[in-house]
Structure formats: C-alpha cells, structure tokens
C-alpha cells in the first residue's frame, strides 16, 4: 500500500485547533523527539541521547514533576530545561472516591494561553483484588453519539495529544503514590492494566493514541505490558488492522447489537462500517488467537438487545473469531432512554453464551455513587458556579 493510500484510510473529524502552552511539556515525546527538542535548545549532539534517557527515566520511572527533582542532571542543565520546557501533566479539578474504592478524576488540560479555553477530560481507577485498571480518555468529548453513552451528549472539541493521554496515567500514579521511591523500589503496582475506554473514540485519534501507548508500554519507563492494555473501538474499521500492526495491544469492540438495524441506532458508526465489515476486520486482526482473544463489549439494555434470540445470533456472528464477550449492565444516567436488563435475564444470556464456548463475564458495576457513567462527572461539574468549581478544585488538591 502506498503512503497516500494508507493516509487516506485514517478517519478525520472536525476539531478545534490545539494551541500548545508557551512552555511545552516534554511528556508524550518519543526518545527521538526528546533528542530533537534538546537539540533545539542547544544541547550538543554527543549528549542528546544520554540526556534524553535521563529525562525518560525521571519522567516515566520516578514520576518527577519538576526538573529540580532530577538530581543526576547538572544544575545548569536543569535550569536550561526549566527555562524552555515543563514536565506538566493535567491538573486535577475534581476527585470522587466511591464506597467500593473506585476513583474518578476530572482533569484540566494545559491551555495555550488566555485566549484558549482550558478543556477537561475524565479518567477512572478501578481497584480489584488481582489488578488495578485505569480507564483513559482519548478525546475531549466524542463525535459518535452512541445512544446509551453519556459522553455522546457532549460535542467533540478536539483530540488529545500523546502527552495528555500519557499524562492521565501519570496523574493517577501521582494520586495513588504508585511511583518508585526509596520506600517502594519496585513501585506499589497499583495500576496494572490500562483500558482506552474513556471519553472519545481512540481510533479517530490514532497517531496520538499509538504514540502514548508505546510510551506507557515501554519496559524502561511506565512498563505496562501490551497484553495488559486494551483499546476499545466502536468500529473504525480502517484503523483496526493498524492497531494490531503498530501498537500491538489487546482489542475490544463496542458491539452492543447483533443486527445492523439496531446497531445503526445504538452505535451510529455502524451505518458507515456495518457488522459484516467490522467482524471481518476482527477476523483479520494481527495476533488474534486463543491466548489473545478479542473482547466484545455488550451493554445489556432491557427489552432492546437482551433476548435469548440475541444471544444465539451473537454466537453465530462471532464464529471463527477468538473472542470473549463482556456483558455490561447498563449504567443509568440522567436523561437516558434505556434501562438495565433484569439480573435474571443477564444471567440467562450469559449462560447461553458460555455454554456455546465463549467466556462471558458480567462486568461488576463500579462507582455508581460517584457519577460513574462516562462523561457524567464532566457534565455535572459544568453546571456548577465558578465558586463551587473552585471549591471542588481545592478539595482535589488536598491529599
């Protein structure tokens, strides 16, 4: 495939122009890009690779928030770096902690100056007995308008940069005390898994998501295995194969319906990439095997997609795909037109799929007491007055 043909496959959405801060953050740059930035400010070529590696270690292993913490870098070099760059990550505007331990953060992104509105996104930490999963956003808002999703009620503003995506992981480690230090030389390992299931469609922001996940999975940095990173897409078919080839993470498909006419309603992207095309892309996904199964997410909507006939059709659709099915009880949010399926019906659906040979875990609802529907915390805080938002921000800054 020619470069021009490949680029033609990349989906585009109308976006607000991103204006970087006056002093850009080094978070989210590759090693080669770090070397280039160091060259821009006069670091001699023989030193660039070594200095870039020092920065990489301090940013992604130690979690340094300021150049002054980088004690094996000379004072002169630290001063020069601080003059031109930062290692800023997003700012915590609000934090909600659920009774079940789930944490949700509303994060303000660095803006390009007084003339640009500071945008906000969410990320969520879900602790479990055997893992800790961080749900990360890829866009400010979303363009897909999925009928059951709260983020779909918010217009797409812009894509996140690689640094803003990596920054969410770093903020979570900051808040959880999950970096390496003298007391915890191997880290606490509270964040073991990453899921790209927050605000936005990751495959409509492919380049930034790819660059961010390559940093997050780098063994000499944050070091989360690619087998513990899952990218969820609503079905941007042209970029599914690229995900396997260029990122190599686990794939999840927001399926939610087994017939095109219903999926057209629930996931409007289906009108562009119908089920036949989507499932063929899954069959062709690089590296898919019984050891690296594709997850199909299926939100359980009462009287809409939860019949045993739907379960039978689901099994037929997935024939030949190394798959597991993640059944998701619908998480209600104000203004939604749907209800969660009855628990007995969810269990019957799960049992049928399991007996057909597919793993069919039912996702345990988490954090319902802290505005857990994706996008809901952002929507609720936008209704607050400036004084109330400042109070939330002050509370979030208090550990």
UniProtKB/Swiss-Prot annotation:
Its cofactor is [4Fe-4S] cluster. [4Fe-4S] cluster binds at residues 142, 146, 149. Keywords: 4Fe-4S, Cytoplasm, Disulfide bond, Iron, Iron-sulfur, Metal-binding, Methyltransferase, rRNA processing, S-adenosyl-L-methionine, Transferase, tRNA processing. It comes from the Bacteria. GO terms for molecular function: 4 iron, 4 sulfur cluster binding; metal ion binding; rRNA (adenine(2503)-C2-)-methyltransferase activity; rRNA binding; tRNA (adenine(37)-C2)-methyltransferase activity; tRNA binding. Its EC number is 2.1.1.192. Residues 128-371 form the Radical SAM core domain. One of its GO terms (biological process) is rRNA base methylation. Coiled coil: none annotated. Disulfide bonds join 135-374. InterPro entries: Aldolase_TIM, Elp3/MiaA/NifB-like_rSAM, Methyltransferase_A, RlmN_N, RNA_MTrfase_RlmN, rRNA_lsu_MTrfase_RlmN/Cfr, rSAM. It is an enzyme of class 2 (transferase). GO terms for cellular component: cytoplasm. It catalyses: adenosine(2503) in 23S rRNA + 2 reduced [2Fe-2S]-[ferredoxin] + 2 S-adenosyl-L-methionine = 2-methyladenosine(2503) in 23S rRNA + 5'-deoxyadenosine + L-methionine + 2 oxidized [2Fe-2S]-[ferredoxin] + S-adenosyl-L-homocysteine; adenosine(37) in tRNA + 2 reduced [2Fe-2S]-[ferredoxin] + 2 S-adenosyl-L-methionine = 2-methyladenosine(37) in tRNA + 5'-deoxyadenosine + L-methionine + 2 oxidized [2Fe-2S]-[ferredoxin] + S-adenosyl-L-homocysteine. The active site is at 122 (proton acceptor), 374 (s-methylcysteine intermediate). Binds 1 [4Fe-4S] cluster. The cluster is coordinated with 3 cysteines and an exchangeable S-adenosyl-L-methionine. S-adenosyl-L-methionine binds at residues 200-201, 232, 254-256, 331. It is found in: Cytoplasm. SMART domains: Elp3. Belongs to the radical SAM superfamily. RlmN family. Reaction proceeds by a ping-pong mechanism involving intermediate methylation of a conserved cysteine residue. Specifically methylates position 2 of adenine 2503 in 23S rRNA and position 2 of adenine 37 in tRNAs. m2A2503 modification seems to play a crucial role in the proofreading step occurring at the peptidyl transferase center and thus would serve to optimize ribosomal fidelity. This is Dual-specificity RNA methyltransferase RlmN. It comes from Rhodopseudomonas palustris (strain ATCC BAA-98 / CGA009). The gene is rlmN.
